[in-house]
From Swiss-Prot:
Organism: Salmonella heidelberg (strain SL476)
Keywords from the named record: RNA-binding, Stress response
Protein name: RNA-binding protein Hfq
GO MF assignments: RNA binding
Function: RNA chaperone that binds small regulatory RNA (sRNAs) and mRNAs to facilitate mRNA translational regulation in response to envelope stress, environmental stress and changes in metabolite concentrations. Also binds with high specificity to tRNAs.
Region of interest called Disordered, as start-end residue ranges on this chain: 63-102
Lineage summary: Bacteria, Pseudomonadati, Pseudomonadota, Gammaproteobacteria, Enterobacterales
Length: 102
C-alpha cells in the first residue's frame, strides 16, 4: 500500500503546503473548490467558506489551479517530466468537450 501512495501523498502535501487552490471532482460529478487544509490515508479536509471532510474513495480527480512541483528528493527531476499540469492539459480537455458536443 505504501508503494501506491508514493505519488499521491507528495502531490497532495505540496498542494496543502503551498496553499494552492484546487478543484476536486467527485465520482458523482460534483465539483468542490478550495484549499487543502489537511489529509490522511482516507480523507482530505478542504477549506473554502467552510471546511469539508471529503472521503478519498469519493474523489475522481484533483485539479490544481496552477502547476505544482510534487516530487520529493528527486535530484534528477525525471518524475516531473512524466506529469503535466496546467493549461495544456486543460486545453486538451476543452477540445475533447467541444468535439463531443458537435
Amino acid at each position: 500500500m505504501a508503494k501506491g501512495q508514493s505519488l499521491q501523498d507528495p502531490f497532495v502535501n505540496a498542494l496543502r503546503r503551498e496553499r494552492v487552490p484546487v478543484s476536486i471532482y467527485l465520482v458523482n460529478g460534483i465539483k468542490l473548490q478550495g484549499q487543502i487544509e489537511s489529509f490522511d490515508q482516507f480523507v482530505i479536509l478542504l477549506k473554502n467558506t467552510v471546511s469539508q471532510m471529503v472521503y478519498k474513495h469519493a474523489i475522481s480527480t484533483v485539479v490544481p489551479s496552477r502547476p505544482v512541483s510534487h516530487h520529493s528528493n528527486n535530484a534528477g527531476g525525471g518524475a516531473s517530466n512524466n506529469y503535466h499540469h496546467g493549461s495544456n492539459a486543460q486545453g486538451s480537455t476543452a477540445q475533447q468537450d467541444s468535439e463531443e458536443t458537435e
